[in-house]
Amino acid sequence: LLEKLKESLGAVLPIIGIVLVLCFSIAPIPNSVLMTFVVGAVLLIIGMMFFTLGAEMAMTPMGERIGTKLTNTRKISVVIVLCFILGFIITISEPDLQVLAEQVPSIPNYTLIIAVATGVGIFLVAAVLRMLFGIPLAHMLLILYPIIFILASIVPQDFLTVAFDSGGVTTGPMTVPFIMALGIG
């Protein structure tokens, strides 16, 4: 619990510090608004602490078990379908992706969420197949980067500007513990 508190503080305190510096220097605000901000920041830290703790407690054991069972199955088609579905669903549940979708007015929310979730599903399949067949990472990158550049040249500009940022939001508190545990399993 203390470790999760430290993680939450590390994520939120810099932002709180910047906001407070701005409030006391160039953008003064009423005391009532400042107190609301401070209370909200404390609740945010506590909420993040419990959320990441719960996500890790739930996702890590589940991911390890699923990963173990997947590697024991001999049907590649089952592995492919399950990995895609797991990557897709776990990404849709990612809170950071929901926030990003709300921040991009030029792309409908569901379009962005589905596109990112599909990408994670596809690349989770690729990662699991790479592990199962012992394919070197360099070979995968030599194949996948040209595909990414070709796709980047044909998608709408509005979509492209958000595409690379979207990769960052998939490394949130839901996706990372699950996918890492899946790989360990």
Sequence positions of predicted segments:
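N-terminal membrane topogenic signal
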Residues: 1-13, 74-75
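Hydrophobic core segments of alpha-helical transmembrane domains in multi-pass membrane transport
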Residues: 13-26, 40-50, 82-89, 119-130, ...
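Short, hydrophobic transmembrane alpha-helix segments
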Residues: 23-35
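Membrane-interfacial loop-to-helix junctions in multi-pass transporters
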Residues: 33-35, 69-79, 106-115, 153-155, ...
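Structural signature of hydrophobic alpha-helical transmembrane segments
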Residues: 37-49, 106-118, 166-179
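Juxtamembrane transmembrane-helix boundary signature
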Residues: 44-62
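Flexible loop linkers connecting adjacent transmembrane helices
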Residues: 56-74, 99-103
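Helix-loop-helix junctions within the multi-pass membrane cores of secondary transporters/permeases
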Residues: 76-148
